[in-house]
Amino acid sequence: MKWLSRSYMAIIFLILYAPIIVVMLFSFNASGSLSHFAGFSLQWYRELFRDGEALTALKNSLFLAVVSSLLATVLGTFAAFSIYRSRSKRYQRVMESVSNIPMMNPDIVTGVSMMLLFVGLTAILKFNDILGLGTMIIAHTTFNLPYVILSVLPKFRQMDKNLTEAALDLGCTPAQTFLRVELPSILPGVVSGLMMGFTLSLDDFVISHFVSSPDFKTLPLYIYNQTAHEVKFSMYALCTLIIIAILALLIMVNVAGSVGERRQKRSSKKVGARK
């Protein structure tokens, strides 16, 4: 049975990672042809960094991902804190369910509804065109919020309440207790939510397609426009760089989570020893 289990897992991993491996491999292909591999070359990476439109789209995507993920992390952390501190279990269940709905909602429905909202605001406020960077930030922050809440709320519930009580007994104000005790305890969840929001924002195409303007194009929109006509090998290089960046983010999240858990365990042991 072991060989069957291992064979099954090998097939699953092959299906999952074969497309990624092919993209990364052909990003170094010297021939510029999909029919054969003529050797390793960095020419497509050089061509990519000479493409001004691609670099502009990359800058737009990075700026949008950073701003929207930071906003979503701040708002989502305080939303999770509010849910956690509520004394009503019914309120907590309702708010959790409401915050989970956008994650189950199809992206195309979210994109169309946001577009209609922004177009309606354009008519009400009598603006010529409201779509652009502002609407992109609002949209990306909105769909990132539930993921931040989902990451942070369990950390609040796993937090050792003895640490909070000890800080209050020692004279800390509620604000100081949150910043010095509770925030370090939930930091792995906050970082996970931030990285998840950054990745989702960087990757988003459907919602961005409906709320963007011709003057502000993100990387997924640029790649789609390019592949709609002819697949350039520089796009393989671009996809490879994105894959490497996301892999680095995942490693950072895992490391931050492990470090945070070890710190929390050490703090709990110290409080227990003092008691």
What does each model-identified segment do?
Residues 1-8, 12-15, 153-168, 174, ...:
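C-terminal transmembrane helix and the adjacent membrane-cytosol boundary/short C-terminal tail
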Residues 2-3, 67-99, 119-120, 178, ...:
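Transmembrane-helix boundary motif in ABC transporter permease subunits
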Residues 18-52, 117, 209-214, 267:
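Short membrane-interfacial helix/loop motifs at transmembrane-helix boundaries
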Residues 45-54, 202-252, 256-259:
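Interhelical loop and adjacent transmembrane-helix boundary motif
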Residues 33-35, 42, 108-141, 175, ...:
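Membrane-interfacial helix termini and adjacent extracytoplasmic/periplasmic loops
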Residues 129-168, 176-182, 192-194, 205:
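Membrane-cytosol interface at the C-terminal ends of specific transmembrane alpha-helices
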Residues 33-66, 88, 228-230:
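Periplasmic/extracellular loop-to-transmembrane helix junction in inner-membrane transport proteins
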Residues 21-32, 189-224:
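Non-cytoplasmic
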